Each structure stands twice: as structure tokens, then as C-alpha cells.
Amino acid sequence: MKATILLFLVLAVVQLSTAAEQLKFVFVTVRGADYEVCDIPGGPKITNKDGKDSKLTEEGKNTVYQLGVKVSELYKSKLGVSKWDSSKNYWPIATNSRRSQISTLITGAGLEGDQSKRDKSWTDEELKKTSFPAMLQFWKFIDPAKCPKFFKEVSQQPEIATTLQDCASQMQEVKKHYDTVDPTKPQHVWLTYETLKKMKKQQPSKVEWASDDMMKKLRECSAKLNWLATTKTDTLRKLSGGLILSDILNDMKEITQGKAQPHATGGTSNKLSLFTTPQGLLIAKLAVFMPPGATLDGKVPTSSEVYPESGATMNTEMYEDNGTWKVKLIYYEGKDYPGKTIKLPGCEEKCPFQQFQQILTKYAVNEQEHETLCKSAQWP
């Protein structure tokens, strides 16, 4: 009898403990919606279509709308939200491209369950509200004129040179069809693969020569090159993701102190940040949130497993229990992939915020530090 009573008491304590811990805030970072194939800055000229002339595809719109629906199903009840409202309890933000801004607003429409916004013609003012000045800084590391140190550091990594050699024959085959392709540039391998992948869906007759085996190899190389370029050294982590890490850690600190996420439209009532980024910036964010020793569902992740496909998201959940805060990271590789928990080295799945900060802060840099580091080398 005493044993039974003791068991009930233990279960009651566990239930009370679980009930006391509440999800308070979520950062959702989304890869932007699929768009009409075009030439991408930094890559080869394959389509001769400028990115500014490229619009979201119908499939892309559907993917991010359904993603918004999924995010609502995951978090609406847990966050205590009765109705999603971008002026009150969630903040849709994006990088400065028009496509990304429209993408984040359509994801927000899915969050709200408002189909009428899926094909809405958004005004310039509505799009402008999704961005703020720091967005321009997050992405500058991919510009050799603004951040030569990144390109210099990448060029000095033997593993990157080896990977380029590993897919040289495939890139030479592509070069037969598109002369501007440079097989010696990591960014050309990545952006060539992403462009051909879109063409195989949107303009298949133009790339019949690109076999499935070739595409598989180019994806493998693209994933590996991106991961090496953002994680191989501490300097690469700081240059690629250090600014966005610094910004998020600052936001999290404000939230743990009962303050609003800076710039958020809903102030302290805001519960969710919905950030739409290009694929490369999502990779850079993963790089700083997955330091050496981090695991993905208990395993050391491969570059292929963290390469963001269409509908990829990274969710940063913040829990609070009587003033004690914890953080949980979840990554979805794409729209049809299950969520996998990112566990930091030496931490539980729900990592105490102070410990979370201590593990990651070495990669965080402010704008001045980033500027100085970017300019600390010449390229080429």
C-alpha cells in the first residue's frame, strides 16, 4: 500500500514538474519558397535570366503555405495563441529580396489559415515591414568584395580542394553546355547544382543530358562544400553565421528578461519569429548552432543530412519554468522530412539557457568585429 502511494506521489510530482515548464517563444527559420529558375549572384550564367525577374512558383507557394499550417499545428496551442495576428503575436521577417519577403508572408498566411493571402498582390509597404537593416549584414559574407577573408579562408582548406576534384568530371560535363561554369569555384558547384535541379523540373528538355547519377554526385559535392565552407574553422563559422548568432542570442536574452524581441511588431505579446532566408544563410545558421560535438537525433550529422531542401526549417524553442529558461533545437531537412533534435555537446536536449550561451558565444560577433574580420585578408 505504501509503495502504491509513493508511486502516485512520484507520478504527481513528475506531472507538476512537466506542467510548470511552458513553451514561451519559438524562432522558426525557413528556407524560402521555390522560384522560377534564374541565374544566382555569385554563380555561373546558365539561364540568362536575372533573379529580379524570377517569381515564386505555384509549387513554392503551396510548400510554404502548408509549412505555415504545419507550424501553427505544432505551436498554436502550446504557445497559448487563440488566433495568429502578425501585428500582435508573430513576426514575419525575411532577407531583402522580394521573393523572400513574399515567401515569408505566404508562410504567415498558412499560419493564420488564410488562403486568400496565398496569391495576394503584396504592396511595397507590406513587404518593407518584413525586413530591417541587419538583414543586409547577415548575407554579406558571400560577397568577395565585402568579405574577402571568407573566400581566402575557404581557398586554404585542403578538404575543399579534394571535394572539388571529386566532382570535377561532372562539372566539366556541365561546362560543355554552359561555358561560364568554373569547376574550380566551390560556389559554382553549389549554384550549378541548384540551378540544374530547378531546370530539371521547370525546363526538362534543356537538361536531358544531366543524368540522375550526375545530379546525385553534384548534390553530394554541393552539400559537402557548403558544410566545409561554413564549419571547417572557427573563423569560417564566425564569418558565415556569427552575425545571425549574435542577433539571436541577444533576442533570447531580452526574452528571458521579460522584454520584447527587438523590432518585433507585437512587442512583449509576440510569441513566434518567422524568418525566411535563402538556402545559404540557413546553412550558415546551422553551422553556428551545431558546433563540433553537436548531434542530430543522437548521431554526428553528415553534410548531406543538414543540406536544406525545399521546406527546410530550423526551430528554436524557448521554455521557462519559474524563471529558469531552456532551449531546444529542431531541424527539418525539407517539407517531407521528420524533425530531428539538435543536441549541443555536453548539454541535454533542452539545454539550460546559460549553458547554451556559453557553448555558442565563441562564434558570435557584432557588426564591427565581423567587418574587421571580413577585411583581414585580400581576395583574390
UniProtKB/Swiss-Prot annotation:
Q: One Gene Ontology cellular component annotation?
A: extracellular region
SUPFAM superfamilies (alphabetical): Phosphoglycerate mutase-like
Q: Which UniProt keywords apply?
A: Disulfide bond, Secreted, Signal
InterPro entries under this entry?
A: His_Pase_clade-2 (IPR000560), His_PPase_superfam (IPR029033)
The record lists its disulfide bonds as C147-C374, C167-C221, C347-C351
What positions belong to coiled-coil segments? none
The answer to whether the entry has keyword Phosphoprotein is no
Molecular functions (GO terms): phosphatase activity
Name where it's found.
Secreted
Signal sequence region: 1-19
Described by its record, this protein's role is as follows: Probably modulates blood feeding of fleas on vertebrate species by binding and sequestering different mediators involved in the host response. Binds histamine. Binds leukotriene C4. Does not bind serotonin, adrenaline, noradrenaline, leukotriene B4, leukotriene D4, leukotriene E4, ADP, and stable analogs of thromboxane A2: U-46619 and cTXA2.
Note on domains (UniProt)? Lipids and biogenic amines bind independently through different binding pockets.
What family is this protein classified in? Belongs to the histidine acid phosphatase family.
- In Swiss-Prot or TrEMBL terms, this protein is called Acid phosphatase-like protein XcAP-3
**Originating organism:** Xenopsylla cheopis
